């Protein structure tokens, strides 16, 4: 009986879910040739399962590379912004744009 437990577990994990799904469709649709229908269903389910495994096992460096490039460009953008704020030429622009920094010019206008 010890051999039946691993066999039962294998069937319950690998075969039963797909077979039950096919049997439900078979009972619902009642095709003219049920065995041919069920056989084709199982073949199709196996093909779909193989495609899913291939998709999951594919390496994804093409998708990760743009993300890495985008992450690398973020500090460069931050450095550019920081450089523009620390540039002495931009300081007068921020001072003149503030109404409280030069009240005499605002009242004359």
UniProtKB/Swiss-Prot annotation:
It is found in: Nucleus. GO terms for biological process: transcription initiation-coupled chromatin remodeling. This is Set1 complex component sdc1. Component of the COMPASS (Set1C) complex composed of ash2, sdc1, set1, shg1, spp1, swd1, swd2 and swd3. Component of the Lid2 complex composed of ash2, jmj3, lid2, sdc1 and snt2. The COMPASS (Set1C) complex specifically mono-, di- and trimethylates histone H3 to form H3K4me1/2/3, which subsequently activates gene expression by regulating transcription elongation and plays a role in telomere length maintenance. Residues 73-87 have a biased composition (Polar residues). The lineage of its organism: Eukaryota, Fungi, Dikarya, Ascomycota, Taphrinomycotina. InterPro entries: Dpy-30_motif (IPR007858), DPY30_SDC1_DD (IPR049629). It comes from Schizosaccharomyces pombe (strain 972 / ATCC 24843).
């Amino acid at each position: 009986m010890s051999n039946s437990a691993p066999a039962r577990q294998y069937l319950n994990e690998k075969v039963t879910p797909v077979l039950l799904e096919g049997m439900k469709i078979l009972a619902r649709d009642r095709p003219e040739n049920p065995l041919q229908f069920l056989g084709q269903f199982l073949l199709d389910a196996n093909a779909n399962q193989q495609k899913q495994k291939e998709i999951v096992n594919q390496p994804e460096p093409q998708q990760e590379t743009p993300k890495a490039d985008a992450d690398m460009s973020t500090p460069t953008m931050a450095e550019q912004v920081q450089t523009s704020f620390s540039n002495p030429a931009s300081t007068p622009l921020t001072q003149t744009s503030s109404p409280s920094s030069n009240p005499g010019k605002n009242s004359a206008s």
